Amino acid sequence: MRVADDKTLLVPDRRGNNRIDTLRNILADPRVALLFLIPGCGETIRITGSAAISIDPKLTQSFLVEGKAPRSVLVVSVEAVFFQCAKAIVRSKLWDASRHVERKSLPSAGMILADLTGGELGGPEHDRTAPERLKATIY
């Protein structure tokens, strides 16, 4: 995410996001809301506005990471900014590591995909190859 000016944010669509549904939603209705959380910080910032999708090579190239550019960049025209106090974050103990759920107590992504697709996708092989896929598609 980059601040372009007082009223514009730029959000790259990084490789691996694969959220084409978000892009379709923006084409149908450009209104957006963004919530910014910083680990360990209780306060949040909420921004509302409208978004447009840019595939301008000059803009996408300005977001290069490890030689790879995003496929598109959301150009968010900011209409309102809200500062949220820390009460909800503090009450939820969101950043308290002692309250975090143990990862092994939850189903893996492969298990969830296998369950949702009747075994057509996912499963142990999906989980086994996940680190390699992540490394290849993170940027």
Residue ranges and their predicted role:
Residues 1-139:
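Binding-site signature for planar aromatic cofactors or substrates
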